[in-house]
Every structure is written in C-alpha cells, then in structure tokens.
C-alpha cells in the first residue's frame, strides 16, 4: 500500500469483521492500515482511511495502550509539529487471536451470568 492508497474492498471487509469482534470502526481502520505497512505516519493513515487527525490520534492512543503499536520520532528539519512513525509490535494474526480470546472470555462471563439469573426466575 502506498502512502496515499485507500483501503481496498478486502481491507474494508477486514475492518467490518474487526468491528464485529468488538473494535470501534476507527480503531479497526487504523489497525488494518498499520497491518499493511512496516511503518507509517498519522498523515498516511488519515489519507488511507479517510479518518480525521483527532480520530487517528485517539485510535493510536488505544492501540499503544494495548501494546499493539509503538511510536518512533522522525527527525524533522526546522520548526513545526514533530512527526511520528508507527508500527505494529505483533503480527496481525496474533492481534486477531487476542481479540478471539477476549471474546471467548466475554461469552463465558455472559453465560455464567445467565445461568445465575435463571436461579432467580
């Protein structure tokens, strides 16, 4: 994917699957974009996903808090805002497996709650 390439139809399908697994759409788009490049900047993610800067920033904060993404400062000549490059810390397949494990845990909790609820009906 070049810096300005938009997400493909296949990418959008992956985004929808991630949303179905519980991620927000912005988080899913950002994650898919990151998975297609070894390293990228926020501006490149904005162009590829159609998200606005604040949306990408919030998604990156969440991905970094999950330890799925690392940030690297890029040296820039002159003044202005610093530029950061981002990359996934895990293969996308491991992130997907983490989401699957989390979903299974949630299902177990819901099933246990429903089982306990039946005792009161």
Per-region residue spans from a language model:
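Amphipathic alpha-helical dimerization/coiled-coil segments
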Residues: 90-121
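Glycine-centered, phosphate/nucleic-acid-interacting loop/turn motifs that mediate DNA/RNA or nucleotide
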Residues: 67
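Short, cationic-aromatic polyanion-contact patches
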Residues: 16-26, 41, 72-96
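Pre-recognition alpha-helix immediately N-terminal to the DNA-recognition helix
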Residues: 29-33
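Key DNA-contact positions within bacterial/archaeal DNA-binding proteins
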Residues: 28, 54-55
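A short acidic, leucine-rich amphipathic alpha-helix
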Residues: 44-48, 63
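Short, Lys/Arg-enriched N-terminal segment that forms or immediately precedes the first helix
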Residues: 3-20
């Amino acid at each position: 994917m070049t810096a300005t390439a938009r997400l493909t139809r296949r990418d959008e399908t992956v985004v929808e699957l991630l949303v179905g697994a519980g991620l927000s759409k912005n988080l899913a788009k950002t994650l898919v974009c990151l998975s297609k490049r070894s390293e990228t900047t926020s501006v490149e993610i904005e162009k590829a996903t159609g998200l606005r800067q604040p949306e990408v920033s919030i998604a990156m904060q969440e991905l970094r808090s999950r330890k799925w993404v690392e940030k690297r400062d890029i040296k820039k000549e002159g003044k202005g805002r610093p530029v950061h490059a981002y990359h996934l810390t895990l293969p996308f397949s491991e992130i997907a497996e983490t989401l699957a494990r989390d979903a299974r845990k949630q299902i177990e909790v819901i099933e246990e709650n429903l089982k306990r609820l039946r005792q009161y009906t």
